[in-house]
A protein has these predicted regions:
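Histidine/acidic-residue-rich catalytic or RNA/ligand-binding cores of hydrolases
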Residues: 74-77, 119, 201, 239-245, ...
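His/Asp/Glu-enriched, well-ordered alpha-helical/loop segment
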Residues: 224, 289-294, 300-386
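C-terminal cap of metal-dependent C-N hydrolases
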Residues: 12-15, 353-357, 373-408
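Metal-associated gating/positioning segment near the N- to mid-region
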Residues: 57-123, 141-148, 213, 237, ...
Length: 408
């Protein structure tokens, strides 16, 4: 079972998931959940609880990353072809640990982690975020999630194994069956690709994949089983197809135009920008990671357009939820995404909402993302006033992370 504790945090400035609160607060976590949020000096210490004097600190809900790949390291590199298949599971233990230590207490895995990874976290066998899993990525033949390479070899990144079926499917009947297979495997949500991508050798991020009818079938089947659909969508046409079909979120959104932004607003479709992703590919290649040059070149080509599209969507009022695509980049650097969101014009409260309550709402989990009575006692204490100093240099700010009231 996950660890739980009783703790009283005193005299702390508070961002509760929605807004910065006036004054300072005492916040109690009892048996792993928030049990009281009161003005500072109101709550008396109990014998059973640990007291944390948070004078001069800002409390936020635990950060929520809506797009990670916890079983993936250096996505797109050639290293996986020479490594034992099972190494990914052992690496994930470290990936999940550093993600939690970075302040991410809940996350949505966008492909790779199966139900066993989620259960290991729930049982407390490993430490990491509260995790919801897609199991794998659903893709059309020759799509972004089809691991078959031009050489005839198959990439090992999402290789099928018991508990993680192949995600490749075609046609309305085919995608209906595949959606059911992924739900049978334990998927909390369905991840699809409605465009090509940067880290796939044989396609183009501007080209659409899956038809509207196929995506609509996936959404209908997922919805019938209480699941939501997230769509890797970079090119304009594929973004539009996914939004029209009813997906809950667009991942990346590199080539957004005015019409597509208006459609997202109309359908209340969330954007998960992953601004970190193309920058991470470029940095990895420059550091000597063996990533094929066409993938690096695509990353260079899209990086600035990506930034412009996210800024435009934000200005128009599209709801944004934080996601990093960690696994493409280095695990544990999740807070860089908050800095990048600030850099495209989001103010501090908007960035923090995107990184807490918006993520919780997108995942359909009202037990996280807010500092409120009854929610899991997941929070981060940042040194200083975030309201005053902002989040532009957040990785350099000293912090303490708590999950279920337990210090990480």
């Amino acid at each position: 079972m996950a660890l739980k504790a009783d703790v009283l945090v005193t005299n702390v400035a508070l961002f509760d998931g929605e807004t910065f609160k006036d004054g300072t607060y005492d916040v109690r976590v009892e048996n792993g959940r928030f049990s009281a949020v009161e003005p500072a000096g109101t709550l008396a210490k109990r014998e059973s609880e640990t007291v944390v004097d948070a004078t001069g600190h800002t409390m936020t809900p635990g950060i929520i990353d809506c797009h990670i790949h916890s079983l993936v390291n250096n996505a797109g590199s050639l290293e996986g072809f020479t490594e034992p298949f099972s190494l990914q599971f052992y690496r994930s233990v470290e990936n999940l640990r550093v993600t939690l230590e970075a302040g991410v207490t809940s996350a949505r895995d966008a492909g790779g982690a199966d139900a066993g990874v989620r259960e290991a976290l729930e049982r407390g066998l490993v430490r990491g975020p509260r995790l919801k899993v897609a199991v794998t990525i659903m893709s059309q033949t020759a799509g972004h999630g089809d691991g078959m390479l031009p050489s005839g070899a198959c990439t090992p990144m999402l290789m099928a194994h018991p508990g993680r079926p192949s995600g490749v499917a075609d046609g309305v009947a085919g995608v209906q069956v595949k959606t059911r297979e992924l739900i049978r495997a334990g998927a909390d949500h369905i991840k699809i690709c409605s465009t090509g991508g940067v880290l796939s050798a044989a396609d183009d991020p501007r080209h659409s994949q899956f038809t509207v009818d196929e995506i609509s079938t996936i959404v209908a089947e997922a919805t019938a089983q209480g699941r939501r659909v997230m769509s890797h969508a970079q090119g304009t046409a594929g973004i539009k197809n996914a939004v029209l079909a009813g997906v809950a979120s667009i991942e990346h959104g590199i080539y957004l135009d005015d019409e597509t932004i208006d459609l997202m607003l109309e359908r209340d479709c969330v954007l998960v920008p992953t601004l970190q992703a193309p920058l991470a590919v470029i940095r990895a290649a420059e550091a000597g990671v063996p990533i094929p040059e066409p993938m690096v070149e695509k990353s260079r080509r899209v990086a600035e357009r990506h930034r412009e599209s996210v800024a435009k969507a934000h200005q128009a009022g599209v709801r944004i939820a934080m996601g990093t695509d960690a696994g493409v980049g280095i695990h544990g650097q999740n807070l860089e995404e908050l800095e990048l969101m600030a850099d495209v014009g989001m103010n501090t409260a908007e960035v923090l909402r995107a990184s807490t309550v918006n993520g919780a709402d997108l995942m359909g989990d009202d037990s996280v993302g807010r500092v409120r009575v009854g929610n899991h006692g997941d929070f981060v204490l940042f040194e200083g006033s975030l309201e005053e100093h902002g989040v532009g240099q957040l990785r350099s700010v000293e912090k303490r992370v708590f999950q279920g009231g337990v210090a990480v």
